[in-house]
């Protein structure tokens, strides 16, 4: 049976699984920013800011460059949610593993898309990232995001603040989980930025490897 449980929680929530997802998440954001015309695949707040700025100045073409990844992100969340509702109780393959396989295939294709089609590549990555963030929302029982930092930063800081007040070990553990994921996201982004700068568009395949490890991990018990 796939998608096994550990201590009443699904293996998809294990910290080690979240670590692979966070590394991949940081890598992908650095990849699209550095190799695909400085557009974020996941930091949609930044895309909203830049889109609005260009629209307000009448630069519609530049604004659309940031609008399309936003639309792709919305569609990715919608598709992942539909897959969950339809295949939540599938026994042959856990629905989360199905999402990972789809993401791996999409990112593998992106590695072949030339610079002349950078917008297409960014749209594909945004769609895949949205499916991931919608699919993996818990880590060790805590709500988190594997593809962005702001929510994790808030939650980690709040947990540490509560620990200073209450001195509960669980609160310190929670803070460590969140800051650990942020650190791993940053490592992924650093690697993504440097590797793509030196070796180009094919480096997105490293994210495929990381997601593949997450996929395989979900066959195991903790």
Model regions: which residues?
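Alpha-helical transmembrane segments of multi-pass membrane proteins
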Residues: 2-222
């Amino acid at each position: 049976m796939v998608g096994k449980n550990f201590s009443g929680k699904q293996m998809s929530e294990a910290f080690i699984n979240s670590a692979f997802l966070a590394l991949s998440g940081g890598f992908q954001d650095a990849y699209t920013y550095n190799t695909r015309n400085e557009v974020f695949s996941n930091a949609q707040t930044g895309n909203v800011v830049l889109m609005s700025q260009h629209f307000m100045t009448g630069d519609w073409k530049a604004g659309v460059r940031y609008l399309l990844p936003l639309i792709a992100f919305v569609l990715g969340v919608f598709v992942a949610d539909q897959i969950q509702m339809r295949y939540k109780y599938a026994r042959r393959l856990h629905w989360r593993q199905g999402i990972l396989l789809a993401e791996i295939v999409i990112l593998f294709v992106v590695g072949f898309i030339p610079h002349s089609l950078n917008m297409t590549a960014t749209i594909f990555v945004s769609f895949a990232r949205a499916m991931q963030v919608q699919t993996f929302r818990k880590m060790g029982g805590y709500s988190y995001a594997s593809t962005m930092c702001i929510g994790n930063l808030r939650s980690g800081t709040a947990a540490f603040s509560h620990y200073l007040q209450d001195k509960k070990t669980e609160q310190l553990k929670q803070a460590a989980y969140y800051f650990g994921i942020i650190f791993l996201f940053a490592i992924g982004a650093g690697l993504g930025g440097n590797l793509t700068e030196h070796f180009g568009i094919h480096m997105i395949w490293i994210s495929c490897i990381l997601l593949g490890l997450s996929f395989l991990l979900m066959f195991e018990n903790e």
